[in-house]
């Protein structure tokens, strides 16, 4: 298996988010006028991600690799917004949010399958994409001037799939109202 991270995802409530991270999310919501997203949370998930190997040479030379050996991602889905908070020892806490009706989701597993099939048909297996499980979320994130993609990795189990399914449903609901 060619995974970059070991992900462990579990459902949580906004009251189960530890106090320092909860305060960061609440401050972000207030600064960006999102309302009480923690109180209005429809879904809340937490994923612990442990890096399985160090970043590649180029990433280490340029400093673009993940500096934390493990980090936590909390996804809070409210009726109109999604808030994503990532916390790591070296990176600190980073909180971003987006309107659900402006979110585009891509299932990397489909792209992953196509790349693997193309590599197999060409007889090239050396540089295949990682087998991590998750979803790429493209949106106009808080404070940004243009849309950007953010990958949310989750565990490849019932909890991880529930996060992806419920997030997809929330985006669909927001776009249809």
Could you tell me what each predicted segment is?
Residues 1-76:
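Anionic N-terminal interaction surfaces
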Residues 5, 9, 13, 66, ...:
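Generic preference for well-ordered secondary structure
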Residues 23, 27, 59-60, 113, ...:
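Polar/charged alpha-helical tracts
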Residues 29, 86, 139, 171-175:
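Hydrophobic, Leu/Ile/Phe/Ala-enriched alpha-helical segments that form helix-helix packing faces
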Residues 45-134, 174:
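Phosphoinositide-binding peripheral membrane targeting modules
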Residues 125-162:
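Canonical phosphoinositide-binding patch of PH/PH-like domains
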Residues 155-177:
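Pleckstrin homology
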């Amino acid at each position: 298996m060619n995974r970059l991270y070991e992900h462990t995802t579990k459902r949580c409530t906004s009251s189960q988010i530890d106090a320092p991270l909860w305060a960061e999310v609440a401050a972000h919501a207030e600064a960006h006028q999102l309302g009480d997203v923690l109180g209005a949370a429809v879904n809340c998930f937490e994923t612990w991600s442990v890096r399985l190997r160090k970043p590649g040479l180029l990433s280490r030379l340029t400093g673009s690799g993940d500096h934390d050996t493990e980090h936590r991602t909390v996804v809070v889905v409210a009726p109109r917004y999604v808030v994503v908070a990532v916390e790591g020892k070296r990176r600190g806490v980073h909180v971003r949010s987006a309107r659900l009706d402006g979110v585009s989701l891509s299932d990397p597993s489909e792209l992953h399958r196509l790349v693997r099939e193309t590599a197999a048909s060409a007889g090239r297996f050396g540089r295949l994409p990682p087998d991590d499980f998750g979803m790429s979320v493209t949106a106009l994130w808080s404070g940004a001037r243009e849309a950007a993609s953010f990958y949310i990795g989750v565990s490849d189990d019932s909890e991880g799939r529930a996060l992806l399914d419920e997030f997809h449903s929330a985006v669909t609901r927001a776009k249809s109202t």
